[in-house]
Amino acid sequence: MATHFIVGCGAVARNNEGKFLMVKQMGGYWRGQWIFPGGKLELGETLEYCARREFIEETGCDLTIKKEIGAYVSYDPNTDFEKQVVLVYFLGNGLSGTPKVGEGVTDVAWFHMKDIEDMAKKGQVPGLILKVASDSIQ
């Protein structure tokens, strides 16, 4: 049973074609899967600042945080990751820069919602991330 919690924040960005910017996680909880840029909240940070900082670190791009999409809880007792993760995702806009592989990721790419749904069926996108994508367009 998880006895520790981690708070993380992430940012969701979409381009004019409706595609989502995603990163392929190098390690950690979702190693090898496509997710939205994000990471751990550091002491003294606001949730919005954390989401933006992680987005910049992982994609090399900046964005403006527009609104909160939602808060989500993730825990899988079948992994060796013995922490419950509380994640807060934000919708961003005004993307500046060209996406590139940044800290802790092995790839960065744009995907349509249909692509994300298909990748989730193949285990390449966590179910929680599929829900965040869906919630962001509601």
Region roles according to the model:
Residues D62-G70:
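A short coil-to-beta-strand element that immediately follows conserved catalytic motifs
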